Design a protein with these regions (language model features):
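Conserved NTP phosphate-binding and transfer environment spanning the P-loop NTPase/kinase superfamily
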Residues: 2-26, 33, 39-48, 203-314
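Conserved nucleotide-sensing/catalytic segment adjacent to the nucleotide-binding pocket
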Residues: 39-54, 122-125, 129-181
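N-terminal pre-Walker A segment at the start of P-loop NTPase domains
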Residues: 47-81
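Glycine-rich phosphate-binding loop used to anchor ATP phosphates in small-molecule kinases
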Residues: 69-72, 81, 85, 155-216, ...
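Pre-Walker A (Motif I) flank of P-loop NTPase domains
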Residues: 85-91
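Glycine-rich phosphate-binding P-loop
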Residues: 91-110
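Post-Walker A helix-loop "phosphate-sensing" segment adjacent to the P-loop in P-loop NTPases
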Residues: 110-122
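Hydrophobic "anchor" residues on beta-strands that sit immediately upstream
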Residues: 123, 195, 221
Length: 314
């Protein structure tokens, strides 16, 4: 198991569970097994104990950081003698493919929305800023999909600048995992959210040929972590589940449909090659090195259970 860097305080799950608010006084009744089933990403795992032990204390920590953010803005406005346009509190969530980032992002959005009521908690992913498959193929980098050069980083940075600048309306391109491509002329629209969650493998990376990090726009950053062999297991397990789903649906437009036309063992072998030649190098060379830029790291073990929380000290 990897060790936390010296500038992180490490909390075991049971220690984290007891922070801030006594466990007996917490109310997570709005998060039900049915809600979890709707929130969790395909083939991911999450339990009610995860909500109580990990995510509820995490929400309290986010609320603390959000309150501090608002105080800082108020004091700055007082110092400057003028009010600055409202700007959302932005949370970035990073980590490997198949590690469970989407589930973490959706659950935090749900729990924060319940906490903040009428305030708007929005969520987007960086997937929509991938170059379309046609463009990746034209540039000869389709096999590098997910690597830094496969994203339209100028567009993503402009989007985040508009979000943080408090623009009235911002739009992000939509991505479909069914066809594994950006959807043409389809967008998600956000109207000045109070809290904005941005999830993606590249959220802590620097843009190529740019001095700006995407994380420069974040007020709090999280990294979902696990041992590489575990992530590989989850990746293959998810592929097999998606393969079975594609076989049952028999939809030729589904990205996984062609794999249903060959023997399962051959399809799984192909998925392992993709892991070894694409996802593993991307994790090793570009994603994992950004882990220590995160303010907080959720470390997972078998069954997607979170066993440690690493909190940056400085």
């Amino acid at each position: 198991m990897s060790e936390a860097p010296f500038n992180y305080a490490v909390f075991q799950r049971d220690e984290w569970h007891e922070l801030v608010v006594p466990a007996a006084d917490r109310d997570t009744s709005h998060v039900t097994p049915k809600v979890l089933g709707e929130i969790k990403a395909f083939n991911d795992q999450i339990s009610m104990s995860d909500v109580a032990d990990v995510y509820d204390p995490l929400v309290h920590y986010i609320k603390l950081r959000h309150a501090q953010y608002l105080r800082d803005r108020e004091e700055r406005d007082h110092f400057l003698g003028r009010a600055i346009k409202p700007s959302p509190f932005v949370i970035g969530i990073a980590g490997s493919v198949a590690v469970g980032k989407s589930t973490t992002a959706r659950l935090l959005q749900y729990m924060l929305q319940a906490e903040y009521g009428e305030q708007n908690v929005a969520l987007t992913t960086t997937d929509g800023f991938l170059l379309p498959n046609e463009e990746l193929q034209a540039q000869g980098i389709f096999d590098r999909k997910g690597f830094p050069e496969s994203y339209d980083m100028p567009a993503l940075l402009e989007f985040m600048n508009n979000v943080k600048d408090g623009d009235e309306v911002v739009r992000s391109p939509r991505y479909s995992h069914d066809i594994s491509d950006v959807l043409v002329n389809e967008f998600d629209t956000f109207k000045r959210p109070d809290i904005f969650i941005v999830e993606g493998i590249n959220t802590l990376q620097a843009a190529p040929n740019s001095p700006v990090y995407l994380s420069d726009f974040f007020d709090l950053s999280l990294y979902v972590d696990a041992e590489t062999l575990l992530i590989e297991h989850w990746y293959i397990d998810r592929f097999e589940a998606l393969l079975q789903q594609a076989k049952e649906e028999a939809d030729p437009t589904n990205f996984f449909f062609p794999y249903t036309q060959i023997p399962v063992a051959e399809a799984v072998a192909g998925a392992r090659r993709v892991w070894e030649t694409v996802n593993l190098p991307n994790l090793t060379d570009y994603i994992l090195p950004t882990r220590e830029r995160a303010d907080l790291i959720l470390h997972k073990t078998m069954g997607h259970g979170i066993n440690e929380i690493w909190l940056r000290k400085f």
